[in-house]
């Protein structure tokens, strides 16, 4: 049986997927340039501006963040949205130093749940299924995403 959650995404052509990726990368780079001074400074160090990024072929131009960068920016230095738009925080335990934190907006969570729902649908899950989510529900985001994704599919969800 064919099963889809978001058929227009799941059945998109390679050309369409690449076009979406290029469009979203350009938009995201502009967003972090405008909203995240820490990352903007990293881009400026490399001599890169949003105008230099036209799509996936330009990824090599962008600076990558290390775990040290994530720690240096702790806790709010990489926020791309105002704190009042954030609805969830996940964090590492900090056993090797400062915690690494990730803040999520409602839109972030919806996108993650949709991504997990597409993966589960591709595996054949649907409303008649019980989905046991054996990932932890602690600081790791996996359990929450699969929980939300299985619920979006209408599965009976069993968190462990």
Predicted regions, residues:
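Nucleotide 5′-phosphate-binding alpha/beta core
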Residues: 1-91, 96-114, 118-122, 126-128
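AMP-binding/adenylate-forming
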Residues: 106-118, 130-160
